[in-house]
């Protein structure tokens, strides 16, 4: 009578998966622009302004969104000026300029977004401008 035990195998190493991610907390600094890719897929582009220090320089990041539910959420509910937390995959690409020199660009593809505080409605912003100009 031998009892059979179950064996589980663990590997100390896993398949190597390198990746680059970026987390940004900032304000949406541009209107959303919709595009259609060559294979007829919809995508969205916008920019985020982030100022890490109160007295520091503002950093601008261009974001691309391919996820359809996120595109719908952004275009329906989020306004310019909104404070957002964005997680994006990051990749550098080298390109050649017209003069033959090489340049590098940072590509950020949004994977997740959290709306922290929405921007002002257009009517609210216009109302404040009118109130300020009539004083």
UniProtKB/Swiss-Prot annotation:
InterPro entries for the chain: NA-bd_OB-fold, Primosome_PriB/ssb, ssDNA-bd
GO molecular function: enzyme activator activity; single-stranded DNA binding
CDD domains per record: SSB_OBF
Start and end residues of each SSB domain: 19-117
GO CC entries: mitochondrial nucleoid; mitochondrion
Keywords recorded for this protein, A-Z: DNA replication, DNA-binding, Mitochondrion, Transit peptide
Gene3D superfamilies: Nucleic acid-binding proteins
UniProt-listed GO biological process terms: DNA replication; mitochondrial DNA replication; mitochondrial genome maintenance; positive regulation of mitochondrial DNA replication
Transit peptide range per the UniProt entry: 1-17
Any matching Pfam family: SSB
Localization terms from the record: Mitochondrion
Functional summary from the UniProt entry: This protein binds preferentially and cooperatively to single-stranded DNA (ssDNS). Involved in mitochondrial DNA replication. Stimulates PIF1 helicase activity.
Oligomeric and partner information: Homotetramer. Interacts with PIF1.
Additional record remark: Present with 3060 molecules/cell in log phase SD medium.
Protein name: Single-stranded DNA-binding protein RIM1, mitochondrial
């Amino acid at each position: 009578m031998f009892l059979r035990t179950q064996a589980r195998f663990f590997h100390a190493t896993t398949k190597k998966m390198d990746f680059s991610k970026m987390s940004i907390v900032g304000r949406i600094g541009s209107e959303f622009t919709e595009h259609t890719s060559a294979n007829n897929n919809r995508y969205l582009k916008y920019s985020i302004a982030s100022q890490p220090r109160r007295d520091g320089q503002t950093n601008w990041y261009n974001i691309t969104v391919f996820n359809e539910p996120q595109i719908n959420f952004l275009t329906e509910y989020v306004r310019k000026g909104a404070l957002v937390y964005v997680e994006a995959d990051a990749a550098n690409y080298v390109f050649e300029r017209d003069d033959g020199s090489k340049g590098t660009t940072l590509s950020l593809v949004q994977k997740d977004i959290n709306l922290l505080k929405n921007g002002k409605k257009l009517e609210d912003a216009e109302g404040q401008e009118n109130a300020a100009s009539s004083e």
